[in-house]
């Protein structure tokens, strides 16, 4: 059986990266929540 997690840096960044988050209103809300919480890393 093939494992479900097949790492790819490109896919990771396109789906969860900073530019991807900034592209949508909800993504920006995610970033703002994480900033408010004081996360060291905002994305990936």
From Swiss-Prot:
Record InterPro entries: Ribosomal_bL34 (IPR000271), Ribosomal_bL34_CS (IPR020939)
Gene Ontology biological process: translation
Top-rank taxon: Bacteria
UniProt-listed NCBIfam families: rpmH_bact (TIGR01030)
Family named by the database record: Belongs to the bacterial ribosomal protein bL34 family.
Species per Swiss-Prot/TrEMBL record: Coxiella burnetii (strain Dugway 5J108-111)
Keyword match Iron-sulfur: no
Location of the region described as Disordered in the Swiss-Prot/TrEMBL record: 1-44
Biased composition range(s): Basic residues: 1-19, 31-44
HAMAP family recorded: Ribosomal_bL34
Gene name of the record: rpmH
GO molecular function: structural constituent of ribosome
Keyword Transcription applies: no
Keywords assigned by UniProt, alphabetized: Ribonucleoprotein, Ribosomal protein
GO cellular component labels: ribonucleoprotein complex; ribosome
Signal peptide, first to last residue: none
Protein's name according to its UniProt entry: Large ribosomal subunit protein bL34
